[in-house]
């Protein structure tokens, strides 16, 4: 599409983790046709990762570098790649030079202050993976899993002064089947959000500009996800622990301890059968039988059976810390004393 440069929608994209990539890709795809101008991509700064401590960009930072090469190869001006610890004077000056019309953000991880937002004549919009005002905050995907919701969704909101309180431009529902992990649901929300975003951005190409509607209903906020959020309390019910395992995959991973060694649990399910007849009764330090966290035995279809404070959980994929992730059968080959022991 041939347009005068001054009439094209000029976008600055802000995002960092993998969930932002489909939205970035969709915007870049359209910008390559000349319909929009992707002025820049702002991401979190590079960080040291892994045991070697090598400095690496975030997922959006890696893709931004490749996109810049692709734009150049097409004879187009490459989007500027911006990485700042804060959005203060230096960042504002860099963005101001790009003269963007609209800020588009998805999981950037920082608050946009009024001085920063004043750089965008059309303001800003944000992709948020929940049905706002439900689950405002940084971990709405994990929250929906932890709460065992039957539906969640994606919202496109105006960026407002207070976090996740902006007027709603569009929403889409995502049905849940109760087996999603944070990883799998992030993938679904990423695709759904990108599709929704492009439809909303098209509305900014014409007058009147979309205004959105105020958020309706009671607001709720996400639990702050921390490393310790993965620690399993076997006194809780099997459905609660199952949801915790799924919500903590891929981070921080659900964890328990066996004979002083940390175990990461990747997959589990609710067990509706009877306790195994060939299992060994687990004992705690006081000698009482079958405590919570007791490893009761196995079910050939479901995995390793563990007693919880409400029901039995079947573990199917797990690992000792820093060792190979294994299906339950292979795991037990290297843990002969596991059945009849207790997880804490």
Report each predicted region and the residues it spans.
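One-carbon transfer enzymes
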Residues: 1-252, 320-322, 327, 332, ...
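An anion-binding loop in the catalytic cleft
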Residues: 2-4, 235-344
